[in-house]
Amino acid sequence: MTAGILCSGLGMAGGPVMRVETGAARAEITALSWDTEGTGREKSNLLRPETAAGLRFRVGGHWHTGAELPTRVETNAAGARTYRITVTPEAEIVWHIESAKGNLALQFSGKGTALGSIETVELSLPFAPGVTPVTALSGDWSAEGTFRLPAIVSAPDFGQMLLTAKSTAAGRQAVHKAGLDGSRAQKFATMVLELAPPQAGVLDTLEFTPHFLPAPAGMVDTALWAQARRGWFNIWQPSARWGDQGNPYSAPAGMLGNNVISDPASCSLWFYADQAFWTPEIAPGISMLPLVRRTIEFWLSGSRLKPSGEVVCYWDFLNFLDANAGPLIASWDYVEASGDLAWLGRNIGKLELVADFLARRDVDGDGLVEATQSGNYGTLQQPARSCAWWDALNCGHKDAYCNAVIYRAWRCLADLEQKLGRGEQKKRYTQLADKLKAAYVPTLLNPETGWLAWWKSADGQLHDYAAPTVNGLAIEYGLVPQERGREILARLRAKMEAVGFTRFDLGVPPMLVPVPRADYIQPHGCGCPKQEDGADTFGQYMNAGITAGHVLHFLAAHYAVGEPGPADKILRAMLERQGRGEFQNGVTDSYPNGIDWTTWDGQPSGYEGYLADSFRFLQAVLLREARFRDRLYRPLAGER
């Protein structure tokens, strides 16, 4: 008997392909992969090396692995394989595996007088995050971190499979629950499905069906959607349960985060929520909104929300201003998309607590929110972090990135207050946003360069690194008048040309000149220069390395000011690269081997390898069109 190999597709170029390899004598799947767009990626096994997908049975309180039990193997003419597993002398489980037209069907039935002795049946799928971080997207998560079907099994850049279950017995739930268990240290993420115990005369079936996300309703120019639809899912990476749950360096199951075995971070929550806002229902019966809500509630509970209203960013790190802004924007995304005013009413007090913490951080009363970090040269020393997602930069005090995000957060909260008919509260957050906007450009515009500096430190210095990201964000959100915004964008494009940057398939660097050592985390942070001028690590990690997600704001700024041409040129180049799966190289957790950041010539300069945040640039496919911009920026309307 030889190993069984099933490879099925639709028989058309670019169509979905499923690859399954089964054990010759043991009841197991040794290789499992797919490619929904027919680009050949199914050749890479999604399962961990030297492991296999298979069954476990609990009998009399003891677990038995199906691959180790006596098994008869049958293969039909089409290559489908059937395993007849003797669990006890009087109980046999029949597992049938077949694939056709890019689908996979796993069928389970039982025979024998002692089927009732089988207490639990589990199907284990040991995925390899180092290949790509496979995870599950379900609209039904329990408080304990399990989920129910239907679900999308999302293999980034391989594609998505709709996982459903059915039974020949009326009312029978073929899969009781499912879960994700992983290890960051050992680099695994295992999906475990608890199947219904076998019942005589009943056939249960699990089906994996290639799934394609339709273009969002109202999209006029759908030509680019085919290039975006598979990667669109890449931003959603519900975590496996990994690490000691009593230690901040861990994650519970089912929280949106960096990747399936990495950290959730409150400063990034709005990235994932914005994308869910556009496509809340990702498949029939599967909404992303409960997962967004679950992650918001995670950050607004327990030790992660301090009595002061400050929100932890990740692990146990505080002093991140965007850690507070993230859940506020995400809450607007959730309520605006779901209409769940009951949830909003129950949580408005916490949202105000979070927002008011930010308001109190305007320590000098000028309207801008000041970070606790001074931002003065040479002050960011490990283990401390900066005030923002850009945690290896020395950004602090009056930070342009954080204040732009806070501006949107306050506008969003004002809109939420209006939904509840809370006029005075709406007025308060509107006034806070108005005051911030009035101070923003006068404080942060560098008259010598004609664009915004990244931050103004406590000693009064402007820290200006020719930043497309920060300037783009401010222009996109209307903090900069449109005419000046066009001038700034033109200056930055000219600067890009002057410094010789041409690799638009990678995106756009977050800054165009080196960050000196004194404005970088010290003494040994990733990308930290040894030279005082920063030239030795220029283009690496947060010293002007490129990460795709934040390119969104530079693109969106062009669309917002009515100059789509330069943005479309960059976006189309990035989409070509995305189609090849080149914005990630699997989970590496090793600096500088992760391609979540690249140098200007495309070499890896990150550590995650896979960073969900990277894929938010795909929202530019929608923000090219005014109707989508109007929806997202509605809380900013009249203030732009």
Describe each model-derived feature in a short phrase.
Residues 93, 99-177:
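Polysaccharide-binding surfaces and accessory modules of carbohydrate-active proteins
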Residues 218-345, 352, 466-476, 529-572, ...:
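Substrate-binding groove/exosite segments of carbohydrate-active enzymes
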Residues 15-84, 130, 138, 144:
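Acidic-aromatic substrate-binding/catalytic surfaces of carbohydrate-active enzymes
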Residues 272-277, 290, 349, 356, ...:
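Active-site core of glycosidic bond-cleaving carbohydrate-active enzymes
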Residues 58-115, 174-191:
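Extended, loop-rich substrate-binding clefts of extracytoplasmic carbohydrate-active enzymes
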Residues 1-8:
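Bacterial N-terminal signal peptides
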Residues 223-246, 270-272, 282-299, 304-306, ...:
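Active-site acid/base region of carbohydrate-active enzymes
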Residues 124-126, 153-222:
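Beta-strand-rich recognition/accessory modules
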